Regions:
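Membrane-interface "helix-start" segments
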Residues: 252-262
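Alpha-helical transmembrane segments of multi-pass inner-membrane proteins
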Residues: 5-55, 61-130, 137-141, 150, ...
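Membrane-interface catalytic loops of GT-C/OST-like multi-pass glycosylation enzymes that act
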Residues: 66, 111-114, 212-214, 276-287
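Helical hairpin unit composed of two closely spaced alpha helices linked by a short loop
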Residues: 235-239
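A membrane-periplasm/extracellular boundary helix in multi-pass inner-membrane enzymes
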Residues: 43, 47-52, 105-110, 127-177, ...
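TM-adjacent membrane-interface loops and short helices in multi-pass inner/ER membrane proteins
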Residues: 160-220, 224-231
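Membrane-anchoring hydrophobic segments
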Residues: 1-4, 310-331
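Transmembrane alpha-helices of multi-pass inner-membrane enzymes
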Residues: 120-123, 137-141, 263-272, 277-319
C-alpha cells in the first residue's frame, strides 16, 4: 500500500509543480532552492569522507544508502553540466564547472558502481547534443589518461574488487573475469524474477507481491507483467520525446542548459535503474519529477512572459510640425 502511495506522490509532485508556477520569478526561486539543496548535500557528503565510510545522504542514521545518494548526485550533476555548457560567459562557465566538481567529489566516495555507470550515458548525451561537446570529450580523455593518478584509493579498490580481486568471487563472469558476490547476488535476483514472471506473464504479482530485487525494469516486469512494463516504457519514451522537443525549442535561450542537462540526467536515470529501484526512491524521484514538470511547462512559461515595451521618445513625426506627433523608437 505504501509503495503505491509513493508512486502516487511522484505524480502529485509533478502536477503540483505544473499548476503552481505561473511566472519566471517563481521558477527561478524554485530552481535556486533545488541547486542550493544539492550544494549543501554535496558539502555534507564531503564532510563524511574522513570517516572512511561510504558517503551517503544526510539524516539517514547509522546505515545509509550510498547508491541512492549517488543516483541523486548524478541527476543533479547532469543539470549543472548542462548549465555549464550553455553558459554565455567564461566566469559563468567556471562557476558551473566548479559546482560540478563539488558534486563529483562525494559521488566518487559513494563507491556506488551503479551511479558511476549512470554517468556514462549522461556524458554521452551531452557529447551528442551539445555544440560544446569538445569540452566534455576533453575532460573524459583527461580523466581516462590520468585518472589512476588522482583517483582516491577507495575508488580504485572498489573497481578492483568488482572484477580483479581474488576473493569474494561469484558465479558470473564479465569478459572472463568473475564478478564479486554482491553483483552476483543481484544477478541471481534478476534470474529469480524472470523465473517468477514466467508464471504470471501478463499482469504480474502486484506491487511488492514478489521478492525484493534491485533492478527497476525486472521489478516492474514481475510486479506488473508485460502490460505494466509496456506502460512503464511508454511513459519513459514520452518523457524523453517531450524533453527532446523542449530542448530543440529552447535552443539559444537562457533555459537551453536546463533542458540539455535534464535530457542527460534522464539518460543517467535509465542506466541507474538497471541496478537500482531508481523510479521508486524518494530521494531521486522527487527532484526528478519536479524537474520533469519544469521542463514540461517551460515553453508555455517562456512564451507567456511579456515582451519588453518599446521606449517612447517624444520627437516630431516626419512631415509634422512641432508637437504634432510622437515617434515610437525601440531601444
Amino acid at each position: 500500500f505504501f509503495f503505491v502511495l509513493k508512486y502516487i506522490e511522484y505524480f502529485v509532485v509533478f502536477f503540483m509543480t505544473v499548476n503552481s508556477i505561473h511566472e519566471e520569478r517563481q521558477l527561478q526561486r524554485l530552481l535556486a532552492t533545488a541547486l542550493a539543496t544539492c550544494a549543501i548535500s554535496s558539502l555534507i557528503g564531503i564532510l563524511q569522507i574522513p570517516s572512511g565510510e561510504r558517503v551517503s545522504a544526510p539524516f539517514e542514521g547509522q546505515y545509509g544508502e550510498p547508491n541512492t545518494f549517488g543516483g541523486y548526485l548524478v541527476l543533479m550533476l547532469a543539470i549543472i553540466l548542462g548549465y555549464a555548457l550553455a553558459a554565455k560567459t567564461l566566469p559563468r562557465q567556471i562557476g558551473w564547472y566548479a559546482f560540478a566538481a563539488l558534486i563529483v567529489i562525494p559521488l566518487l566516495f559513494t563507491l556506488s558502481r551503479t551511479s558511476w555507470l549512470a554517468a556514462i550515458p549522461m556524458l554521452l548525451t551531452l557529447i551528442v547534443l551539445s555544440p560544446r561537446r569538445l569540452i566534455i570529450i576533453g575532460g573524459v580523455l583527461l580523466a581516462l589518461a590520468f585518472g589512476s593518478s588522482f583517483m582516491p584509493k577507495s575508488v580504485i579498490d572498489r573497481y578492483n574488487y568488482t572484477l580483479n580481486a581474488k576473493v569474494d568471487r561469484g558465479d558470473y563472469a564479465i569478459g572472463g573475469a568473475k564478478v564479486d558476490t554482491s553483483t552476483s547476488a543481484r544477478l541471481d535476483s534478476w534470474k529469480q524474477g524472470f523465473d517468477g514472471w514466467v508464471k504470471r506473464p501478463f499482469f504480474g504479482y502486484g506491487v511488492t507481491g514478489f521478492g525484493f530485487m534491485d533492478a527497476q525494469f525486472v521489478r516492474v516486469l514481475v510486479e506488473a507483467g508485460l502490460f505494466g512494463l509496456a506502460a512503464f516504457i511508454w511513459l519513459l519514451y514520452r518523457i524523453w520525446r517531450t524533453a527532446r522537443g523542449v530542448c530543440r525549442q529552447l535552443a539559444g535561450s537562457r533555459y537551453e542548459g536546463l533542458a540539455l542537462g535534464y535530457l542527460a540526467g534522464f539518460a543517467a536515470m535509465i542506466m541507474h535503474c538497471i541496478g537500482a529501484n531508481t523510479f521508486i526512491i524518494v530521494r531521486i524521484m522527487e527532484p526528478f519529477w519536479f524537474l520533469t514538470a519544469i521542463i514540461t511547462l517551460l515553453p508555455a512559461l517562456v512564451v507567456s512572459e511579456p515582451a519588453p515595451q518599446p521606449a517612447l521618445l517624444a520627437s516630431p513625426a516626419v512631415g509634422a510640425g512641432p508637437g504634432h506627433g510622437i515617434a515610437a523608437i525601440p531601444r
